[in-house]
Amino acid sequence: MKKKLFVSELIKHFDLEVLNHDFPEIEDREILTPSIKRLGLELSGHFIYDAISGVIVGWGTNESKFFEKIGSEKAKSSIEEIFSRKIPMLVLSKGFDKNYYSTIIEIANKHKTPVIFYKASLSEINTILGIYLLQYFAKKVQVHGTLVSVFGMGILIVGDSGLGKSEAALELVQKGHVLISDDAVLVSHYGNKYFGKAPYITKNLIEVRGLGLIDILSVHGLKSVLPECEINFVVELKDYEQNKSNFDRLGNKVLKYQIGEWKIPKIEIPIRQGRSVASLIEASANMFLSKLNGHDVLAMIQERSLNDE
């Protein structure tokens, strides 16, 4: 089912100032897309289908200058045409000319549309509201796994049941790292990044065999939990005996973990009795950071071998 967001929810979340709040017949319309449209051709009367229906419209300094240029009558006609398209709300930035407020509010009331004033530039409004809208509308996939933040890197730990994902997460928390979610992770993708969070019912909880449910927030404090974080890579725990001929010994393979149509960088860790999984996950985080900084161990070895000849 498609997620819905109504204007009233956005107004409440950001405590937005509604300029025509005293007009009782304003409709609580549904926002259909995660974007704020500035309008270009539309202001001059050229519309492509109903491209702005269900889209938040934002106006700033450039729009008020355009209205000034075309004159009050044409400006009024243009504003009327915009509101007739059933936009959910209009956001005016601090740079928009207040001389047009009365005209806009009069037309907005006629079409039962809320007009919002946000004390920021339109680019700032696009960033603040836009990020929230992207997160709200982003597709979410539930994954069986555990999400932790290690040295600031979001690591999704996956693998068969019984390999010690939760135990490793608990040990990482005891070492000072951060839990985001255990057992189930809601993964979303927006921009070019992946993010994970806990389902509400399991938030801040770890289930460890023999101990039961542990409330990490109560036991280890606020520093040990986060509501959400970016997923930088996946660590897949694999039974050594069942997969010993398939492991990448040199770490030179490019591995990916697939979640739906998404592919996230992956590191495989073989699990054997007596190995500290938490320490290996810490090492994988350090290796990942090292690679991001351009350090390539295999290239270094090749260079050494050439210099040794």
Curated annotation (Swiss-Prot):
BP GO annotations: regulation of carbohydrate metabolic process
Active site: 144, 165, 183 (proton acceptor), 249
Residues annotated to bind ATP: 159-166
GO molecular function ontology, one term from the record: protein serine/threonine kinase activity
Domain of life of the native organism: Bacteria
Top-tier EC class: transferase
Pfam families: Hpr_kinase_C (PF07475), Hpr_kinase_N (PF02603)
Cofactor: Mg(2+)
Enzyme nomenclature, EC number: 2.7.11.-, 2.7.4.-
UniProt keyword annotations, A-Z: ATP-binding, Carbohydrate metabolism, Kinase, Magnesium, Metal-binding, Multifunctional enzyme, Nucleotide-binding, Serine/threonine-protein kinase, Transferase
Keyword Coiled coil: no
Catalyzed reactions: [HPr protein]-L-serine + ATP = [HPr protein]-O-phospho-L-serine + ADP + H(+); [HPr protein]-O-phospho-L-serine + phosphate + H(+) = [HPr protein]-L-serine + diphosphate
Region spans: Important for the catalytic mechanism of dephosphorylation: 270-275
Stretches the record annotates as Important for the catalytic mechanism of both phosphorylation and dephosphorylation: 206-215
Binding residues annotated for Mg(2+), in chain numbering: 166, 207
Gene3D superfamilies: HprK N-terminal domain-like, P-loop containing nucleotide triphosphate hydrolases
InterPro entries: HPr(Ser)_kin/Pase, Hpr_kin/Pase_C, Hpr_kin/Pase_Hpr_N, P-loop_NTPase, Ser_kin/Pase_Hpr-like_N_sf
UniProt keyword annotation of ATP-binding present: yes
Domain notes: The Walker A ATP-binding motif also binds Pi and PPi.
Further remark: Both phosphorylation and phosphorolysis are carried out by the same active site and suggest a common mechanism for both reactions.
Reported function: Catalyzes the ATP- as well as the pyrophosphate-dependent phosphorylation of a specific serine residue in HPr, a phosphocarrier protein of the phosphoenolpyruvate-dependent sugar phosphotransferase system (PTS). HprK/P also catalyzes the pyrophosphate-producing, inorganic phosphate-dependent dephosphorylation (phosphorolysis) of seryl-phosphorylated HPr (P-Ser-HPr).
Family, as annotated: Belongs to the HPrK/P family.
Subunit field text: Homohexamer.
Full protein name: HPr kinase/phosphorylase
The gene coding this protein: hprK
